[in-house]
A protein has these predicted regions:
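Proteins that catalyze or organize thiol-disulfide redox chemistry
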Residues: 1-57, 64-129
């Protein structure tokens, strides 16, 4: 039996999963719903990819059950893939991605200079205050 490598994300466990012990987490989130055909097609791709990246948390949000979470991410169409690194949303895009595209996206997200990303977020916050 294969180990379930994806986590069901809810508003109850969201902070714990996304921030982790030290807020250094790398999380991919698949926003989906049972009635959504493309979501069902993307699910095995998401699962297979999760097996190849044990250091990344692959999480799924059932947008029907978790409407508040879906609203918080401003999800307008599904599936939508979001990537959070160190507590920062670094990518969000609707559409069922082919496996190669998903792998490429993960590689790009791994290469991000998070110090730079955090500096950018801080600068953005400063202009809003």
């Amino acid at each position: 039996m294969a180990m379930m490598s994806t986590v069901e994300l809810t508003k109850e466990n969201f902070d714990e999963v996304v921030q982790g012990e030290d807020n250094k987490e790398f999380v991919l989130i698949d926003f989906w719903a049972a009635w959504c055909g493309p979501c069902r097609q993307f699910a095995p791709v998401f699962e297979r990819t999760s097996d190849k990246h044990p250091d990344i948390t692959f999480a799924k949000v059932d947008t029907e059950a978790q409407q508040e979470l879906a609203a918080a991410f401003d999800i307008r169409s599904i599936p939508t893939l979001a990537i959070i690194r160190e507590g920062v949303l670094v990518f969000a895009q609707p559409g069922a991605l082919p496996e190669a595209t998903l792998e490429d996206l993960i590689a790009q997200a791994r290469k991000l200079d998070m110090a730079e990303v955090h500096a950018g977020v801080a600068a953005q916050k400063a202009t809003q205050d």
